[in-house]
């Protein structure tokens, strides 16, 4: 499964350079140069990491950090020219996970990205939830050691829910993350796949949030 990163940087040259470097490392990168656009993208998609500048048009990095952190625990790396103690302390007080000042070495940035992803579990070789073991590299799910006959889409939906355990994912987020931006289907597509997925699981671990979406409980 690909790792998806939201990159928010208003300097076009830096933004393009970082995006290209991360893409070369096989990360999927959504890049934007405006704070308001970043806000929209964050709620329309699911990301395993956010790289966030502070000085941005629209909402600034500190505002976005507070907003994003109030929603979930997605790792957030601040990437900014502001090297003073006050801005760093402010960011860490708002629960930023790391803080990198410009200029920086691209290889060091990549190592910091890898460290945050490893710490969050996004680079895990397997995920365990209840009686299930998910193996992302092989798109396989085992229940008490026995493989379940999930389709590729069913596996991707289950993994997405596991990676966001405790967070409600809307129909729109699931559609865009699993089927992509250009998919013409609607919420019924998600509903059908969830129904089929539930029928193959040993117990109903997927909770429906009526009118919103689906969630895996944090306690699993």
From Swiss-Prot:
Matches recorded under Gene3D superfamilies: 3.40.50.2300, 6.10.250.690, Winged helix-like DNA-binding domain superfamily/Winged helix DNA-binding domain
Entry comment on modification after translation: May be phosphorylated by VanSB. May also be dephosphorylated by VanSB.
SMART domains according to UniProt: REC (SM00448), Trans_reg_C (SM00862)
Keywords tagged on the record: Activator, Antibiotic resistance, Cell wall biogenesis/degradation, Cytoplasm, DNA-binding, Phosphoprotein, Repressor, Transcription, Transcription regulation, Two-component regulatory system
UniProt superkingdom: Bacteria
Pfam families reported in the protein's UniProt record: Response_reg (PF00072), Trans_reg_C (PF00486)
GO cellular component: cytosol; protein-DNA complex
The keyword Cytoplasm is annotated on this UniProt entry: yes
Modification type 4-aspartylphosphate: residues: 53
Compartments, as annotated in UniProt: Cytoplasm
Domain Response regulatory as annotated: residue spans: 4-117
GO BP field: cell wall organization; regulation of DNA-templated transcription; response to antibiotic
Keyword DNA-binding: yes
Binding region for DNA: 124-218
GO molecular function: phosphorelay response regulator activity; transcription cis-regulatory region binding
Biological role stated in the UniProt entry: Member of the two-component regulatory system VanSB/VanRB. Activates the transcription of vanSB, vanYB and vanW in response to vancomycin which results in vancomycin resistance.
PANTHER family: REGULATOR OF RPOS (PTHR48111), STAGE 0 SPORULATION PROTEIN A HOMOLOG (PTHR48111:SF32)
Official protein name in the record: Regulatory protein VanRB
Organism annotation: Enterococcus faecalis (strain ATCC 700802 / V583)
